[in-house]
Every structure is written in C-alpha cells, then in structure tokens.
Amino acid sequence: MIGKLSGKADSQGDDYVIIDVNGVGYLVYASGKTLDKLVEGEFYKLFIETHVREEHIHLYGFLTLEEKNFFNLLQSVNGIGTRMALSILSNLTPDDIQIAVNNEDKNIFKAISGVGAKLAERIVLELKDKVTKISSSSAIKDSLNIKNITPVTSNEVMKALINLGFSRFEAQNVVQGIITQNPKISIDELIKTALKNRNSKFFS
C-alpha cells in the first residue's frame, strides 16, 4: 500500500494530478483546494490514501494529514463515497467542516453540489462526536465551547457577521474573542464590537 508520494507535479485534470516520482507518473485524485496549491514542475510531498478495487488501484492525495483524516472521516457517513468526500473538501477546509458540524450548520453542506438536506443532516449528526478527535487546529478546538461560554446566541451572530462580509472562520474567531472578554454582552453589542474590531487582534 502506498502511504506517501514525493515528487514533481506534472499535468493536472479536473480532479487529479500526475506526480512524477523518479520518472514514474502516479495519477493521484485530490480535492480542488489541494489542486489549486500545486504548481507544475514543483516538488511536493503528498499523503496518500490507497483504495484497491478488483480492477483498479486509486490513489487519493493530500498536502496535510488533517485533510486525509477528514477524507476518511467523511466517508464514515452513510451515503458519502470518495468522490463526494473530495467534493466536500474542495469546498470546505477541515476547520470549516468542524465549525459547521459543531454549530449544527446544515446549510453550509447543502450549498455543495450533490449534498441534499438529508445527507447534510446525516453529516452533522454522524460527525458530531468525531470531528474533535482528529482535528489538529487548536484555534478551532478552543472555539468549540463557544455555546457554553455565554447565553448569547452565537449562531445568530455568526450568520449576521457572515452576511456582513466576514468569512466563517473570521466570524468564529471574533465571536470567541469578544465573548471571552465580555461574557454578558448582548447580541447587538457583540455585532457592533465585531465590526469595530474586524482588523484587530482577534484576526492576528
């Protein structure tokens, strides 16, 4: 079984890259986010998940072990195979997935082509107790207790901030930072403070 490949990125397709290892080209399927980071002719180390079928051996490559772990984690959900797992990882980072699952945000998954309401619900339900076990992001781990810090409805605030131009990760970080300093803050004040401090230490 192949666990890692180190070589030069050769040609790319919509969902794969050819990795040249000492003159041998390996076809490796990857997420769109991974493919976007690869430059032809540059040297990369890819962590590989090998799937053996009766007639084929498929290689799936990842720049980080975390993405590889989430690739396998997503496939533990009933109805998600390798193609759908890569599609989700093409749209969401592991941190995005963890935040969405933790906040029971089904809509972020429903926005992905091929993910319907039922599958989005299964992702949230089936991964709820699993995502924290494999994520390596301390920032996201620290933010998982956000609902327990304050009675403020953090989901409503995050959605409002996203509508105002924040990324999901920015919204999570700024809400966490403000609530830590002022646990009794109101929703209105939290949003106002977030807007004032968008470029402050909460994003450093």
Curated annotation (Swiss-Prot):
Signal peptide: none annotated. It comes from Rickettsia canadensis (strain McKiel). This is Holliday junction branch migration complex subunit RuvA. Has three domains with a flexible linker between the domains II and III and assumes an 'L' shape. Domain III is highly mobile and contacts RuvB. It is found in: Cytoplasm. Residues 153-204 are annotated as: Domain III. Residues 1-63 are annotated as: Domain I. It holds the Pfam family RuvA_N. Homotetramer. Forms an RuvA(8)-RuvB(12)-Holliday junction (HJ) complex. HJ DNA is sandwiched between 2 RuvA tetramers; dsDNA enters through RuvA and exits via RuvB. An RuvB hexamer assembles on each DNA strand where it exits the tetramer. Each RuvB hexamer is contacted by two RuvA subunits (via domain III) on 2 adjacent RuvB subunits; this complex drives branch migration. In the full resolvosome a probable DNA-RuvA(4)-RuvB(12)-RuvC(2) complex forms which resolves the HJ. Belongs to the RuvA family. The RuvA-RuvB-RuvC complex processes Holliday junction (HJ) DNA during genetic recombination and DNA repair, while the RuvA-RuvB complex plays an important role in the rescue of blocked DNA replication forks via replication fork reversal (RFR). RuvA specifically binds to HJ cruciform DNA, conferring on it an open structure. The RuvB hexamer acts as an ATP-dependent pump, pulling dsDNA into and through the RuvAB complex. HJ branch migration allows RuvC to scan DNA until it finds its consensus sequence, where it cleaves and resolves the cruciform DNA. Residues 143-153 are annotated as: Flexible linker.
